[in-house]
């Protein structure tokens, strides 16, 4: 055994061994319990960042731990390879997106290998390869045949100068990123998948996910947004038109004072025909892109249409307004406004002097000042004809019944969830497999024509997608007739919605999935990824699993049993202000720091002498130049050190603050472990451990070893508090470094302890443990060694320390045999001088005994 710990020598050798032996190759084995551990696959942006390293280290620790516990483990890896950044990089670097992507994959794959992750590389998936997206295209055609896919017009960002559609990321302050032309909102036909058909299942099946974080489930519940209400139809005065609204508050129906419609509502557009001012307002509102999240805070604007709706119960004429806070794609594109009981309606009414009719009062009869704000709680109904005096539920049902009876309303369950628009007017994505015939009919591309391959050898001009710019690409035939291929491509969330399932049979060519393999491995046992994916990817992932189930590929309802959302990685960020008043962010690796006695930064200077402002710990990002290159850290300290720091510095689901001092600490710990094994190896145990021949000290040390094993097993296996598991091992190591090695049983206890420590650390720091396991004289490799089991007998204590109290105050501490009875302990306590002193002259009225811990006298 080498005296010095040299990760640079060990790690490459161990990784080479794993690659040659295919140590982590997963093969279906019905006789073994499977464990499928999956971390969200990366977008091949060029380099791994610390967020990736954290995600994949957590997954690797869980995978290796489960393998040691006898499970048949699948841990695959691949590349979410389509997406907009490749187009931008291709234009900037004058290359094709495919070439840029494949080069990045090669580089990043090597980075993953250097970190020692135990992936089954034989199952690698690259989503931009035709053999992958062929089956996605086929599945889309099957969904179309089932009626789950349709085409409708939808709004996109449109650059009139380049005549192209822009992604949200390409719109900068309302203008095109390339030419600065003001961006318009344009309606174009797009493909949608009916996720709303599955809304109820997606909602109710959240109850089947007890091991998903509550926060993610709450976010999905809110995103799906189930509500119960009434759809009400108003007649438009002096016309045969009607206006339909949906409300969850029919109890406020008598308080409606106006109706508001979206700018794109047909009623608004017909009213604008002879009203140029209204037409201009509608044009402006349509071209202001508003995210739903911004609706609450933006300025409410509106204009009267001159039309009126008739209240079906009171006959009142209610003005119809166009309002910028009503969205056409949400509900019916029209709302009934009750300013007295809805704050948004209230603000709009105040601005445009519209009336307010209170119809609810607080249940406790307290007065409400409507001049200040709306009363939005449930309460007692007033000013509502025969419904006066009723509570919310009775009024809701009474008014809903009456609306249904007079034929203008129907009870309805609505969802906030919208259908999934999967069309993208981009090049670097999977082509949508639909054909348009010369007569205008739209048909699915037949299986024998799939995959519709995206050409990879293209030149990007930054304006038009190469497949849209080349009219020849779209030309094809269908049953002998001329046809045109769809030139839109899929939203890249399509690829990431089913990759987890394809990993179970990545080379299978007869179908999308091999059902036998899929049903052996699925559902995923442990999924790991960021909480930022809660309402997009994680919802589509669940939706796709239900589609695969209904297509007969899988039998389970949900794609993954357990979800862990790891926290972000933060680092110090520093900047100075340039002469042009621009913030120049400086990498922390180029900063010299001065700290006060509490470790706080008081001065920061970069290599060029600029005095820097420390803006605190923020998420590692390119924009703040505070990312730390994992590669550099591995070269400096070794992969095991980086992995150990990542798992120790913070609980997995909390943010992790990158501190190089912490990395150095992790490295020192591994050196101590190496040195301890080296020292032991100078004179190793020659005889086996004999538990009956141990001294008190040896028993105590062995007890600590087995208690640590029990804690670490629980922390990693059940609680997933990896940092506390490592802390327990470090605490044990402190005891081991002080332990005697003077006799044979000392060395036998140490041999057992070191073998246990190496096995416990193996999932976290596998390279050093691989080597130390051999150095400790084990014949087999540690990769297939079983997890260490705590010996219950070793943990039994011979003696207990019992605290003695008199009237709640500690007066003595006594060490007694562990099996001593309560009565015997009482006698020992009474024999203590200090106890006698405080009981002197008092009568004991009660004693309290807490098994093996506390004996208390209550005396008067």
Swiss-Prot record:
The keyword Methyltransferase does not apply. GO terms for biological process: leucyl-tRNA aminoacylation. It is an enzyme of class 6 (ligase). Keywords: Aminoacyl-tRNA synthetase, ATP-binding, Cytoplasm, Ligase, Nucleotide-binding, Protein biosynthesis. ATP binds at residue 622. It catalyses: tRNA(Leu) + L-leucine + ATP = L-leucyl-tRNA(Leu) + AMP + diphosphate. A motif ('HIGH' region) lies at residues 42-52. A motif ('KMSKS' region) lies at residues 619-623. Its main location: cytoplasm. Its EC number is 6.1.1.4. InterPro entries: aa-tRNA-synth_I_CS, aa-tRNA-synth_Ia, Leu-tRNA-ligase, Leu_tRNA-synth_edit, M/V/L/I-tRNA-synth_anticd-bd, Methionyl/Leucyl_tRNA_Synth, Rossmann-like_a/b/a_fold, tRNAsynth_Ia_anticodon-bd. It comes from the Bacteria. It holds the Pfam family tRNA-synt_1_2. GO terms for cellular component: cytosol. It is found in: Cytoplasm. One of its GO terms (molecular function) is aminoacyl-tRNA deacylase activity. Coiled coil: none annotated. PANTHER family: LEUCINE--TRNA LIGASE, MITOCHONDRIAL, LEUCYL-TRNA SYNTHETASE. HAMAP family: Leu_tRNA_synth_B (MF_00049_B). Belongs to the class-I aminoacyl-tRNA synthetase family. This is Leucine--tRNA ligase. It comes from Histophilus somni (strain 129Pt) (Haemophilus somnus).
